[in-house]
C-alpha cells in the first residue's frame, strides 16, 4: 500500500510540475498578396500589397523586387526604394489582422512584369514571429505614350 501511495504522490507531483511549464507559442500564419493591375506605357499604375493574418499584426518588414526596365517606382505607403528594389516597413500596434500598402509605379515598356517578395518578416501583436506565404503581382502593360515617361530624379 505504501508503494502505491508513493506512485500516486509522485504522479500527482509530476502533473503539478507540468502545469507550471511554459508553452512554446506557435507562429501565426499570414498571406502576402498583390493586386494584378493593367496599364499602358507612360501611365501611372498602383499595385496594392496586402498582408492578412488570423491574429492581429504588429510589424511587417519586406523587400520587394521588380523589373526596372518595365516599371519605375514613384512612391508607396511606408515604402522606399527604386532601381528594382522596394523596402516596406510598418510597425502598427493597432493594425488588426490586415496591413495594406499601396505602391505607385510608372509603366516604362510594354509587356507583362511582376512585383515579387524577395524577403518578408512579421511579428504579431503577441510578439511572435509570423510565417508569411508570399505571392506576386502580375502587371500587364499595353502600348501607350512614351512621351509621358518621367525621368528619375538623381
Where are these regions (language model features)?
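N-terminal secretory signal peptides that target proteins for export/translocation
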Residues: 1-4
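Acidic, low-complexity intrinsically disordered segments
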Residues: 6-7, 11, 18, 23-154
Amino acid at each position: 500500500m505504501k508503494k502505491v501511495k508513493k506512485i500516486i504522490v509522485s504522479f500527482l507531483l509530476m502533473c503539478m510540475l507540468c502545469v507550471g511549464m511554459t508553452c512554446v507559442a506557435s507562429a501565426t500564419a499570414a498571406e502576402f498578396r498583390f493586386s494584378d493591375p493593367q496599364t499602358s506605357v507612360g501611365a501611372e499604375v498602383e499595385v496594392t500589397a496586402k498582408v492578412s493574418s488570423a491574429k492581429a499584426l504588429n510589424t511587417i518588414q519586406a523587400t520587394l523586387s521588380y523589373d526596372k526596365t518595365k516599371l519605375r517606382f514613384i512612391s508607396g505607403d511606408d515604402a522606399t526604394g527604386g532601381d528594382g528594389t522596394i523596402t516596406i516597413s510598418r510597425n502598427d500596434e493597432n493594425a488588426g489582422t490586415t496591413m495594406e500598402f499601396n505602391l505607385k509605379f510608372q509603366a516604362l515598356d510594354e509587356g507583362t512584369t511582376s512585383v515579387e517578395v524577395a524577403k518578408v518578416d512579421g511579428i504579431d501583436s503577441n510578439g511572435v514571429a509570423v510565417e508569411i506565404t508570399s505571392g506576386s503581382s502580375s502587371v500587364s502593360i499595353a502600348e501607350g505614350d512614351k512621351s509621358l515617361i518621367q525621368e528619375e530624379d538623381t
